[in-house]
């Protein structure tokens, strides 16, 4: 991998090609991360697990190492080749996903899921920083939103193919097949992307930004940036329910609507795909139009969207038919993912380019440790707790109570909108001076 010289990022690799390659890797990231949601149905039956055990396997097992290793790996990515780190991460998480298919017990599957988390820890934050070095600030929210399409596309494909393979073969084969399918993406990242200049679109003359500072300096910068913490905890609050839904809704459709795995894969996969793609793209598109002139808009977009998403999901839980449920859940999914482009773009902008990977990892640490680690567990634990009262409908009420986290997220983003403008221009001054 050749190192970048001087000049703009466009001198290294065309931005569109880079975005396409990283999007492919991110799709596999979420296929491997979320496939366990639909496979939880046959796994629960075969291994005789409770909802709480399923939530630990799907949440804590993944989140501990995924969140904990993200910051040191991102610190390394601010200094070394981000391309090499991303390629190695894709290969590692793909191999551990395949290893999930070899598990014969709860603890074996728990450990394999830990391995998936270790691999994915090095994929996202370096990718955010890499994308930001290929696109100027006025196009960055849309570019990051396009990259973030990997979330709904990967989640939908994981649900669809996971359900189809498990129905026609078994759940172990589903893990092995999708895991091995991701390995070529690692090679494509390695050979298809050339490392760009860091901060070439953010410095006054297009030259590289200053070398990455010590971690203590990054921490001090983040500590002095209130909007970073508000954006992070706003995302984390929304992700408590977001990750909980992607894991538990397949089981909800099985228990409350009596759908088969292939039906769940098609039904819920289409909700995630249509709603997620529309919401992610439109959120970034709107962010690029309102954000540069008024940075508060980057926080107001998710504030409004989460406020509306909560009642959409609540109505969908009690819809009288699958068709009405599909419409309500799709609208809710669209609104719930609109935050990705605007918020990620704002996080990239409020710190200098040489701090981006570490700042992104810190943001992801908060978001994922709370969202994945607590959200999946919360809904599973609540479902077990309410099981004696509601029976197979316990997940319906568990999700209903969890919708309060969307409203909490909206409130945090409204507060963030009052602080973001000052931090936005402070980050701009630091980037230019670098």
What name fits each language-model region?
Residues 68-104:
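Conserved MFS/SLC helix-loop-helix module at the cytosolic interface between two early adjacent transmembrane helices
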Residues 112-152:
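Cytoplasmic helix-loop-helix junction between adjacent transmembrane helices
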Residues 147-195:
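Helix-loop-helix hairpin linking two adjacent transmembrane segments in secondary transporters
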Residues 59-73, 270-283:
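Central cavity-lining transmembrane alpha-helices of secondary-active solute carriers
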Residues 5-11, 198-232, 256:
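Juxtamembrane intracellular "pre-TM" segments in multi-pass secondary transporters
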Residues 36-37, 225-281, 336-340, 344, ...:
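Extracytoplasmic gate region of multi-pass secondary transporters
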Residues 39-68:
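Extracellular/periplasmic helix-loop-helix junction of adjacent transmembrane segments
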Residues 48, 81, 102-108, 136, ...:
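Helix-breaking motifs and short loop linkers at transmembrane-helix boundaries and internal kinks
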């Amino acid at each position: 991998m050749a190192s970048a010289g001087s000049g703009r990022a466009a001198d290294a690799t065309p931005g569109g090609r880079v975005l396409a390659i990283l999007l492919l890797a991110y799709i596999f990231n979420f296929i491997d991360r979320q496939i366990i949601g639909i496979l939880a149905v046959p796994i629960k039956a075969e291994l005789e697990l409770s909802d709480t055990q399923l939530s630990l396997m799907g949440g804590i097992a993944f989140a501990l190492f995924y969140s904990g290793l993200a910051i040191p790996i991102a610190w390394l990515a601010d200094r070394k080749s981000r391309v090499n780190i991303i390629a190695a991460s894709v290969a590692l998480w793909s191999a551990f996903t395949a290893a999930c298919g070899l598990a014969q017990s709860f603890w074996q599957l728990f450990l394999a899921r830990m391995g998936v988390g270790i691999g994915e820890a090095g994929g996202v934050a370096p990718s955010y920083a890499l994308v930001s070095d290929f696109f100027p600030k006025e196009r960055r929210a849309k570019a990051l939103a396009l990259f973030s399409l990997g979330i709904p596309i990967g989640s939908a494909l994981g649900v669809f193919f996971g359900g189809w393979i498990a129905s026609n073969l078994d759940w172990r084969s589903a893990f092995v097949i999708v895991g091995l399918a991701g390995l070529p993406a690692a090679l494509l990242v390695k050979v298809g992307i050339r490392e760009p200049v860091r901060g070439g679109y953010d410095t006054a003359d297009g030259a590289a930004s200053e070398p990455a500072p010590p971690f203590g300096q990054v921490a001090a910068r983040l500590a002095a940036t209130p909007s970073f913490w508000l954006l992070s905890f706003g995302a984390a609050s929304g992700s408590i329910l977001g990750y909980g839904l992607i894991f538990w809704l397949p089981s909800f459709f099985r228990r409350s609507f009596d759908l088969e795995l292939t039906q769940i894969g098609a039904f819920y996969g289409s909700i995630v795909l249509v709603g997620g793609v529309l919401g992610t793209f439109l959120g970034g598109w709107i962010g690029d139009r309102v954000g540069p002139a008024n940075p508060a808009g980057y926080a107001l977009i998710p504030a409004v969207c989460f406020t509306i998403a909560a009642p959409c999901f609540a109505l969908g839980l009690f819809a009288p038919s699958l068709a009405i449920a599909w419409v309500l859940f799709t609208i809710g999914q669209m609104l719930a993912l609109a935050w990705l482009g605007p918020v990620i773009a704002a996080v990239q902008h409020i710190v200098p380019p040489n701090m981006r990977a570490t700042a992104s990892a810190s943001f992801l640490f908060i978001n994922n440790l709370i969202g994945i680690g607590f959200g999946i567990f919360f809904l599973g634990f609540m479902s077990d707790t309410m099981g004696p009262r509601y029976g197979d409908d316990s997940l319906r009420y568990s999700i209903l109570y969890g919708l309060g986290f969307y409203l909490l997220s909206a409130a945090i983003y409204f507060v963030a909108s009052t602080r973001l403008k000052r931090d936005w221009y402070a980050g701009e001054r630091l980037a230019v001076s670098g």
